[in-house]
Each structure stands twice: as structure tokens, then as C-alpha cells.
Amino acid sequence: GLQHYALQRDIEVVLFDGRGVGNGWLLPAGPLREPPSRRRDFTVVNAPQLTPQLIQAVGGRPFQMRLASEYAEPLAGGERVPLASFKGKRITAAAGIGNPKRFFDMLRGAGLAFSELPLPDHHDFLDNPFAGVDADVILITEKDAVKCGQIENLVGDPRLWVVPVSAQLDGALAEQIVEKCRGCSTA
């Protein structure tokens, strides 16, 4: 809603990923919809660490967010298991998202070793990119699971496991948002 100026707002939160502001240019020449200098109440960066360069690029006093997961669940449904239970197996991690590296980094952070299968963003999976994959386990994102779950031969592949993620936010961010809300009018 930052670009919808007619929308009444009490708080503005801008979320950047770990790549920061890219080339710093606005669409269509760059990745930004608004200039980094645009006023906002809170800046959140989804990155494993906030480097001085990243902090300077996004401006303000950013809060850190990390995506994490501890378990996976079969695409076909069933019991979820800890990611650690896949250690020692031949694993491929596949991601058809805008930044597959973030998914792969999260899995490495969970202690897994695997081969990477980056797919184009919004991949439709009709070509079954897993047919020739020699792995005991194929880990996929929740976003990709939505599409894979509609394709019968993929749902039947017992190697496919979905890795749900949760956002881990800086506790100070929630406190400051609540404090800011207390000062907002309810008109």
C-alpha cells in the first residue's frame, strides 16, 4: 500500500531483502517502487546479518528479520519431520522463487548438505523438473508446493517434501509498533 496514496495509513513498514536496494533506481530501471529516502516508520531487512553497507543502503534504523524452519512435511500430506532427520541422505533443494539462494541458505543454516535446483520464478512444474533428479529427498518451498500439489504425478512422488518457513523478527520491532499504535487515532 505504500504506492496507494489514497489509502489512510497509521504505520508504514518497508521490507527489504538481503540484497538491499539493488542499483538504487526506481522501476522499470531498477527494483525499487519508492526511493530509499521515502519516509516510513519502520524498516525491516530480511537477511542473515545487517552489514554496515546494507544498513546504509536501506536507510533509517533497520530491524532484522530471518526466515527459519526446523521441519519438513510430505507434499502428499502426513507427519512432519525435523530437517535434521534428512542428514546423511541424498538431498536436492529446489526453488522456483525470485531469490532461491535465500531458501538454499536457510537450509544450509539448518545443517543440511544438498545439491541445488534453482528454477525460474513462478515455474509451473508441468514439465516435472524432478523426473531426472537422483535424490532420496527433494525439498521445496511452500510457494512451489501450491503448484506441485495440483499435479498428480508430483503429489505421488514420495521424495517431495515441503519446507514451511516462519519469520523471526526482532522483538524490539513489535514493541515499537505497539507503542506507535497507542499513539494513533482511531477515527
Predicted feature descriptions by range:
Residues 130-137, 143-187:
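Generic C-terminus detector
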Residues 40, 96, 138:
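Residue-level signal for inorganic ion chemistry
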Residues 12-15, 37-47, 59-69, 87-88, ...:
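Conserved beta-strand/loop subsegment of P-loop NTPase cores
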Residues 1-58:
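Phosphate/Mg2+-binding loops and adjacent switch elements
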Residues 22, 49-55, 101-102, 125-126, ...:
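Short, charged/polar "capping" segments at the starts of alpha-helices
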Residues 15, 93-94, 139:
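Short hydrophobic segments within beta-strands
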Residues 70-122, 126-127, 144, 170, ...:
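Redox- and metal-dependent alpha/beta enzyme cores, enriched for Fe-S-associated oxidoreductases
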Residues 7-8, 33-39, 56-58, 85-87, ...:
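Short, conserved loop/helix-junction motifs that constitute active-site signature segments
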